[in-house]
């Protein structure tokens, strides 16, 4: 799996919003709460021109959105001719004052030149996920975990949660707990300052990024 922690803010303050984009190949995209419940996405024009100051946003279409502070999960699926469908599974930490969007972007021209692609790239818009954070996105960063899988090679992750991190110093501290199907648990802590002492559950670290893997009581990675 892959971990993406994206912090963003204006140095001078006065942040209006910060947007996180992710594009993936495929014909279908399913955006729900992390527990699988519906977010009740509704059609929207909110992304159009990004409030009249980013005109490239006008290329997005079929936009739907929901305002939610819940953790979410998005699955992008390539429907393969041999039915061994390939998926990219994304879990993202929720935050107050956040909106999530599903949308379509223009097709990906470069990939259309690759031979033996599983579907007609030029005829398929690009699946697009957007998360919009009102205000700063430094102390409320975009935190995502990505895992590819297929029908014949299912993913290893059974759940992703985002436990709170305690620290005696104010800062952008992130906790991630990744439970795998074979019993391994990976705990991750990230801080915007490697000098800050951070604690989450049984894990205490002083680092910008630290991972502790444990399988059935045995430490397997630090």
Residue ranges and their predicted role:
Residues 5-45:
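Acidic (Asp/Glu-rich), glycine- and aromatic
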Residues 129-140, 146-222:
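Non-catalytic terminal regions with compositionally biased, polar/charged low complexity
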Residues 9-16, 23-24, 121-125, 134-139, ...:
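A structural signal for short secondary-structure junctions
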Residues 5, 60-62, 75, 118, ...:
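Generic recognition of flexible, low-complexity loop/linker segments
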Residues 41-123:
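Trp/Gly-enriched beta-strand surface patches
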Residues 19-21, 87-94, 101-105, 183-195, ...:
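Short amphipathic beta-strand/extended segments with alternating polar/hydrophobic composition
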Residues 1-4, 8-13, 141-142, 146:
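C-terminal substrate/ligand-recognition segments
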């Amino acid at each position: 799996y892959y971990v993406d922690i994206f912090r963003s803010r204006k140095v001078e303050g006065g942040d209006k919003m910060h947007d996180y984009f992710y594009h993936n190949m495929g014909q279908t995209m399913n955006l729900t709460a992390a527990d699988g419940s519906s977010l009740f996405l509704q059609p929207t024009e909110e992304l159009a021109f990004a409030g009249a100051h980013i005109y490239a946003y006008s290329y997005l279409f079929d936009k739907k959105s929901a305002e939610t502070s819940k953790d979410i999960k998005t699955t992008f699926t390539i429907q393969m001719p041999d039915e061994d469908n390939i998926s990219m599974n994304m879990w993202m930490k929720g935050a107050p004052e956040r909106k999530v969007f599903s949308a379509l972007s223009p097709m990906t021209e470069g990939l259309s030149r690759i031979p033996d692609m599983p579907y007609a790239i030029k005829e398929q818009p690009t699946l697009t996920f957007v998360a919009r954070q009102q205000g700063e996105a430094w102390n409320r960063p975009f935190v995502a975990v990505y895992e590819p899988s297929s029908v014949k090679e299912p993913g290893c992750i059974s759940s992703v949660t985002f436990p709170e991190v305690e620290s005696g110093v104010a800062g952008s501290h992130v906790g991630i707990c990744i439970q795998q199907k074979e019993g391994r648990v990976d705990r991750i802590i990230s801080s915007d300052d490697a000098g800050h002492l951070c604690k989450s559950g049984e894990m205490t670290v002083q680092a910008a990024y630290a991972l502790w893997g444990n399988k059935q009581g045995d430490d397997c990675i630090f």
